Regions:
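N-terminal glycine-rich anion-binding loops that anchor highly charged ligand groups
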Residues: 45-57
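A short, small-residue-rich loop immediately preceding and capping a beta-strand
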Residues: 159-162
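Non-catalytic pre-domain segments flanking phosphatase-related domains
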Residues: 1-23
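Ser/Thr-glycine-rich phosphate-binding loops at phosphate-binding pockets of nucleotides
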Residues: 31-33, 143, 165-171, 239
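Helical "lid/coupling" subdomains associated with nucleotide-phosphate turnover
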Residues: 21-24, 38-40, 58, 62-91, ...
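Hydrophobic residues embedded in beta-strands of well-ordered beta-sheets
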Residues: 34, 47, 169, 179-180
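N-terminal basic/disordered segments at the start of proteins
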Residues: 16-48
């Protein structure tokens, strides 16, 4: 399970270097939050994280309910990126130096081109929207990096890497470390939350039927590429994964946590029954 992101903007304890030499930064504009990471890369490709920041965002709520980003959503994003820009200036980095990517909320927003233009004009950042297949590949690279000292997790048996986002769930299937397929499923926490809100006007069993139907459809799609009963390693990424790891262990992890299968299933069942 991936490393924990802080929930508020804060300065790193590492200290602020005086120049941008060897420094890189990236920003992800996601459905539920906007995240920044600053890192130093040495001549051998080694990575040292210097700073992280994250802020909650309403973009997914806008797009998945109205189909477009609201004016308030745009203003909120500009304010967050402007605060990130101030932090980056301390590292000698300018908005034009930063890789900024947008995921499912921006992919689906009907006014995404206008949004990107406004962000560039008002905050100075150029936003690149990544398609779902690239997002899944980036997820794979992140997992490989996090598990570089424990590569057998991905090579000793068939594996599934899964990230549940606000708008989509990204899934990759690996057969002894080799990618078999990747899928972007239209199942996300914000979409499900909207269905739960609507289910207040439906019979009590509606939401359970909705989830079972969507999960069964997803499993049928995945099983065409690799029998799911042959998957023995399950890698879960994202805030829900970090929450589960914390609840089951009582502590945070710098890169990943290994959870007992039976305990995880029991925990998931308890959450479903709440």
């Amino acid at each position: 399970m991936s490393d924990v992101q802080p929930q508020k903007l804060q300065q790193s304890k590492e200290g602020m270097p005086g120049s941008a030499e060897g420094l890189h930064a990236a920003i992800e504009i996601g459905s539920t939050g906007i995240r920044l990471i600053v890192a130093e890369i040495d001549s051998k490709g080694g990575l040292k994280i210097l700073d992280r920041a994250s802020k909650q965002s309403r973009l997914g709520r806008d797009v998945f309910t109205m189909g477009s980003i609201s004016r308030d959503g745009l203003r909120e994003t500009v304010a967050i990126l402007s605060s990130f820009s101030e932090l980056l200036q301390g590292y000698g980095l300018q908005p034009s130096d930063i890789q900024v990517i947008g995921t499912s909320a921006l992919r689906e927003a009907s006014n995404r081109d206008t949004f990107i233009d406004r962000i560039n004009l008002q905050a100075g950042f150029h936003v690149r929207i990544v398609e779902d297949i690239e997002e899944t590949y980036l997820m794979y690279l992140a997992v490989k990096k996090a598990l570089e000292d424990e590569r057998s997790f991905l090579t000793r048996s068939n594996a599934m890497i899964l990230e549940v986002g606000g708008g989509t769930t990204e899934v990759m299937l690996l057969k002894k470390g080799q990618m078999v397929s990747s899928h972007s499923l239209s199942i996300g926490t914000l979409r499900m939350d909207e269905q739960i809100r609507e289910s207040a006007r439906q019979p009590p069993q509606f939401i359970e039927m909705y989830l079972e139907s969507n999960i069964k459809t997803a499993c049928d799609v995945l099983a065409e590429d690799l029998p799911l009963d042959s998957v023995h390693t399950f890698v879960l990424i994202g805030s829900d994964a970090r929450f589960a790891a914390y609840c089951l262990s009582g502590k945070n992890f710098s890169h990943y946590a290994v959870l007992d299968r039976a305990q995880f299933i029991e925990f998931a069942d308890s959450m479903a029954n709440m």
